Amino acid sequence: MDVRFYPPPAQPAAAPAAPCLGPSPCLDPYYCNKFDGENMYMSMTEPSQDYVPASQSYPGPSLESEDFNIPPITPPSLPDHSLVHLNEVESGYHSLCHPMNHNGLLPFHPQTMDLPEITVSNMLGQDGALLSNSISVMQEIGNAEGAQYSSHPQMAAMRPRGQPTDIRQQASMMQPGQLTTINQSQLSAQLGLNMGGTNVAHNSPSPPGSKSATPSPSSSVHEDECEDASKINGGEKRPASDMGKKPKTPKKKKKKDPNEPQKPVSAYALFFRDTQAAIKGQNPNATFGEVSKIVASMWDGLGEEQKQVYKKKTEAAKKEYLKQLAAYRASLVSKSYTDPVDVKTSQPPQLVNSKPSVFHGPSQAHSALYLSSHYHQQPGMTPQLTAMHPSLPRNIAPKPNNQMPVTVSIANMAVSPPPPLQISPPLHQHLSMQQHQSLAMQQPLGSQLPMQVQTALHSPTMQQGFTLQPDYQTIINPTSTAAQVVTQAMEYVRSGCRNPPPQPVDWSTDYCSSGGMQRDKALYLT
């Protein structure tokens, strides 16, 4: 980038003399760059842009009409070599109107231009080298090595760039748009704090990005809280894990079968049995341990011939035991084969006896189809019983709407079930007798709800071409109350015919059980 410097023109007499800040040479303001108000920091001008003298007008607020009350920052208590750094810290930039330094920014004269207030947040948003260098300069004021680092830019770049905690807190508390002016008292207070607290940072051999080995109080407190919480959680989890473990059930010893042969004992055990009674008789107060010691000494004192007698007894007992064991195992195997056969043969009678239904085979499908179609046509009846629960017998039907509880007693039923779709004449005659009895018992009950004893409800036409018409035969019990169980018997009887219907050869048993095909109107045969 080409930077052109123009010779200083004649300064008008009306221009006020710019006071010098610090011992730095006070050069002419025309060599300084213009300040860009939008960017809030100094920037290099374009190569094609000419420098405008102070006598010419340029857009922006008038400088001559405004008064700038910038107090001179020259603390007398500080040494001379630190004044240069104070100017840099106050303005956020390095020495005024010098040639380009290592920061890459042209210095400027603060009193000849519209200089907005410098904010810490804007300093944080600028180049990292500018911020780190300015803060490191503040840290070096109380140290004797500060002059050496500031005189050499390469050493200043190698200098640690740790930020003090008070500067970080101040930068985090500032809002981006808040403007703060650094005066002498604030600067001296910050410098005093830095002089007392930041000397250790220069002697630490750790690199710039390394963390200190000693944790801060806040972090140590947080770690302690985390440890306590982990201990509490661990203490809570341990009982849960203990509770989750099932208590070990002691292994139950297998009960020995009394039929199982017992193992033979050794020769010494046989000798022990023989001599134990004699020793107990001589020493009744002797314990089992003392008796066993005496028996062991006697066994050692026996000769080989006496020992062989006991050994022969044990060998004979072993042979007998093996024979008995083989026979016992063979009996167990034979029982394991015969038990499942007995179970299988005993199951079919139970299945047959568990279904005491009147009709069998296709007639059950007829009853289910008839109930579903009938109650679909008449919504007054309760449709909950149309599913025909398996536990209910097939001869039970739901009660009509809001009638008195009735009980059905069907006597003299045939024990053996009739063939499908066939009703024996004695049964039909018995049902007709029950119908007449129910009509006779209904006459005195005129004040109660009317009850229809015989309901002609027709089912859809079957495959044979005739219609099944059921008769509801009910016998009213005068002593029945509302708490009694309500049952009704539904029997299928062909209207006008006592003979059983012929069963064709092409009858399909799956026809009626394929689903409840429902009709809107009942079909009648004329």
Swiss-Prot record:
Disruption phenotype: Mutant mice lack lymph nodes. The development of Peyer's patches is compromised, detectable only in some mutants. Peyer's patches are much smaller in size less abundant when compared to wild-type littermates. T cell lymphopenia is a hallmark phenotype of TOX-deficient mice. Residues 246-256 have a biased composition (Basic residues). Disulfide bonds: none annotated. Residues 228-245 have a biased composition (Basic and acidic residues). Induction: Transiently up-regulated during key developmental transition of immune cell subsets, likely marking a developmental checkpoint. Up-regulated during beta and positive selection of developing thymocytes, upon activation of pre-T cell receptor or T cell receptor in a calcineurin-dependent manner. Low expression is detected in precursor bone marrow NK cells, then is up-regulated in immature and mature bone marrow NK cells and later down-regulated in splenic mature NK cells. (Microbial infection) Up-regulated in LCMV-specific CD8-positive T cells. Expressed at high levels in exhausted T cells during chronic infection. One of its GO terms (biological process) is lymphocyte differentiation. GO terms for molecular function: chromatin DNA binding. The keyword Transcription applies. Pfam families: HMG_box. Belongs to the high motility group (HMG) box superfamily. The HMG box is critical for TOX-dependent CD4-positive T cell lineage commitment. Interacts with HBO1 complex composed at least of KAT7/HBO1, ING4, MEAF6, and JADE2; this complex is involved in histone acetylation. Interacts with DNMT1, LEO1, PAF1, SAP130 and SIN3A; these interactors regulate chromatin remodeling. Interacts with an array of proteins involved in RNA processing and translation and DNA replication. This is Thymocyte selection-associated high mobility group box protein TOX. It comes from Mus musculus.
